From Swiss-Prot:
Cellular component, GO, one term: plasma membrane
Matches recorded under Pfam families: Gasdermin, Gasdermin_C
Transmembrane domains' residue ranges: none
Changes after translation: Cleavage by CASP8 relieves autoinhibition by releasing the N-terminal moiety (Gasdermin-C2, N-terminal) that initiates pyroptosis. Palmitoylated.
Positions of the UniProt region annotated as Triggers pyroptosis: 1-226
InterPro entries to which the protein is assigned, alphabetical: Gasdermin (IPR007677), Gasdermin_pore (IPR040460), Gasdermin_PUB (IPR041263)
Domain notes: Intramolecular interactions between N- and C-terminal domains are important for autoinhibition in the absence of activation signal. The intrinsic pyroptosis-inducing activity is carried by the N-terminal domain.
Entry similarity comment: Belongs to the gasdermin family.
Keywords for this protein: Cell membrane, Cytoplasm, Lipoprotein, Membrane, Necrosis, Palmitate, Transmembrane, Transmembrane beta strand
The protein, known as: Gasdermin-C2
Induction profile: By type 2 cytokines in response to type-2 immunity following worm infection.
GO term, biological process aspect, one: programmed cell death
Length: 480
């Protein structure tokens, strides 16, 4: 159970209990969430929104020779967390074979964090300041696309170098039929050690406040609430191909055309599981319309990034697509960009949006889950995992309180041995307490978002795997 950077960030946010405090998910971007850095908010489909650093600070956009408020710095606060899991189970598979599986996980951190902040009274120095005449290109894009921008006004930074460490180990004993299946004797296993350095100055959590830009001046709102737009005087005119924003009202069973009022942001409609299920189904249906060759490139490229466990590559690719930049990129991400530049796919299907949908779902998950997803694809257990996750989400999605539930035996039956251990670890990383020899658990509201992202990721990968199953390609890195 490697204790990843994003998991530690979420843990620290929970312990700080600060209102509107958000975790930083990617270590490579941990220095891009410092004070005054500008963030672009982008929706993550059904699960949440993503704050993307644009690479500029507010101070870069203002006219020179102006006073800068002095930040307030708190004393360092220590945060220590150690988590260990030791699971064993004896499993029966249709009375054909009897075997055992064990999982041992350990992870934790010892971090000192201090906050740097600019309180609202000090922000008055920057209110109504004039912007540069020649603004960066990204500002023009955001104005045209009506993107909202935010500025970091409080950041929780690591006050000294530290290290995240962890260990995960799966041991599988097999007998009878499974001895031939796995071609081993006695015990098979997998063990991984984790060690992630976190340099001083890395931001674990932050607060943001919205920017409003009008008449070439900027105003920083007191909070990040969506009551105004960053560019309030810029209407987004509907095109012939996309005249209105169409959404489904499930309760009434009606299609409704809704034009978003100028100068305001529409609050997202209530999402129940049926909405999420329909959204994922629609996306995978479009994915299935792509050519087999395109799906092969996407699958092999995504799997290479998942196997490498390099969240930065996934994150960089997502940022490039979010900012509509199809420039050069090495490795598997570059192969996906090559396909996008070809633009030879089905004209009715937006390949970029489909890849973004998958990347946004993957970025909700932990580093451990990314690697476990790759293993799940290779083991061919995705359809069973999709149904299992669906069986958890469907009855519990709308409830904000803790509810005990029991996993259905018929859904667990195909997931035996290492497949069950991998699936349980995926669920545990979402925040559910799982035991291999116990199908009972408890619904936790905080698990809703990562479980939804896991459901979307599994469904996407299942469709890609299905398209590639006839040719049976190697799914290891370097396939294409």
């Amino acid at each position: 159970m490697g204790y990843s950077f994003d998991r530690a960030s979420k843990d620290v946010v929970k312990k700080l209990q600060g209102r509107d405090l958000r975790p930083v998910e990617c270590l490579s971007d941990a220095t891009k969430f410092r004070l005054f850095h500008i963030l672009q908010e982008t929706p993550r489909s059904g699960w949440e929104t993503e704050d993307i650093p644009v690479g500029f600070t507010l101070l870069d956009l203002l006219e020179p020779n102006f006073p800068v408020p002095e930040p307030e710095v708190s004393a360092p606060k220590p945060f220590i967390h150690v988590q260990s899991t030791d699971l064993e189970a004896n499993l029966n598979v249709a009375d054909i074979a009897r075997g055992g599986v064990g999982y041992v996980g350990y992870g934790g951190y010892n971090i000192e964090v201090q906050s740097t902040s600019i309180p609202n009274p000090k922000l008055e120095i920057l209110q109504n300041r004039k912007l540069l005449d020649n603004l960066p290109t990204f500002m023009k894009f955001c104005r045209m696309e009506r993107k909202n921008l935010y500025v970091v006004t409080e950041a929780y930074e690591v006050s000294k170098d530290t290290m995240l460490t962890g260990l995960s180990s799966v041991n599988l004993s097999v007998k009878g039929f499974f001895k031939q299946l796995f071609k081993v004797r006695g015990k098979a296993g997998r063990s991984e050690k984790y060690s992630i350095p976190i340099p001083k100055g890395s931001v674990l959590a932050y607060k943001k406040q919205q920017l409003v830009i009008e008449n070439n001046t900027c105003v920083i709102l007191p909070s990040a609430t969506k009551k105004k737009m960053t560019f309030p005087g810029t209407p987004k005119y509907a095109s012939a191909s996309e005249p209105t924003e169409i959404y489904r009202t499930e309760l009434q069973g009606l299609w409704i055309n809704d034009i978003v009022p100028i100068g305001r942001i529409q609050e997202p409609a209530h999402l129940d599981f049926m909405c999420l299920q329909n959204e994922v189904y629609k996306q995978t249906e479009q994915l299935a319309e792509l050519s087999k060759g395109v799906q092969e490139v996407v699958l092999s490229s995504i799997l290479s990034m998942l196997y490498e466990g390099d969240r930065k590559v996934l994150y960089d690719l997502m940022n490039m697509l979010e900012l509509n930049q199809l420039g050069h990129m090495d490795g598997p991400g570059g192969k996906i960009l090559d396909e996008l530049r070809k633009d030879s796919s089905n004209p009715c299907v937006d390949l970029k949006d489909l890849i973004l949908y998958l990347l946004q779902a993957l970025m909700v998950l932990s580093d451990s889950q990314l690697n476990l997803l790759a293993q799940s694809v290779e083991m061919g257990i995705l359809p069973h995992q999709v149904e299992l996750v669906k069986s958890i989400l469907q009855p519990n999605f709308k409830y904000p309180w803790n509810i005990p539930f029991t996993l259905q035996p018929q859904l667990l039956a195909p997931l035996q041995g290492e497949g069950l251990a991998i699936t349980y670890e995926l669920l545990e990383e979402c925040g559910l307490k799982m035991e291999l020899n116990n199908p009972r658990s408890t619904w936790d509201l905080e698990a809703k978002m990562p479980l939804s992202a896991l459901y979307g990721s599994l469904s996407f990968l299942q469709q890609l795997r299905k398209a590639n199953s006839s040719s049976k390609p190697s799914l290891r890195p370097g396939y294409i």
